[in-house]
Amino acid sequence: MAQKIKPPQKLIAYLKQAGIKHNLLEHKTVYTAYDAAATMKRKLNEIAKSLLVLAGKDYYLALIPADHNLDFKKLAKVVAKFSGKPVKVVKIPSEKVMENLLKIKAGAMSAFGKLHKLPVLMDKNLTKVKKAVFSSGSFNHSIEMAVKDFIKLENAILGDFGIKKKAKLELKKRIKTN
């Protein structure tokens, strides 16, 4: 059983200093965006999944709705456009790299890249909701705030790099055919 982690004080101070309206949500221990949605009784598209990615030689924080998967080729194009350099490979680094580079536990990737000096890339599908729930870097706390405020705060680069998961669509098709 995971030990309860306090909300990251650095993040709380960051949000307070920025004067950003937000809600600190305390919840049972969760390790995935899917579990966070179920625990907080939220729709998957309202949960921002935070992914550390390595594009070429640089690290970025990619945010996609929890009901989407990451399209690595599309993300490479977004990064290339942003950086002005061609990007051949985009990958998710190992948990060890995450722990060593950012000094965080695997699975507790905060959505707030500025705290880690990482550029934030946000899939445009997250802008379809007014408010979203973002990872705080704790397994027991999340931050709910307006998506437009998050974009402004983090200088998030918007792009199209999420693919809607097919699981729900396939389930609906099976139900209709029965």
Give the positions of each predicted feature:
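Extended, low-hydrophobicity, polar/charged segments
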Residues: 1-178
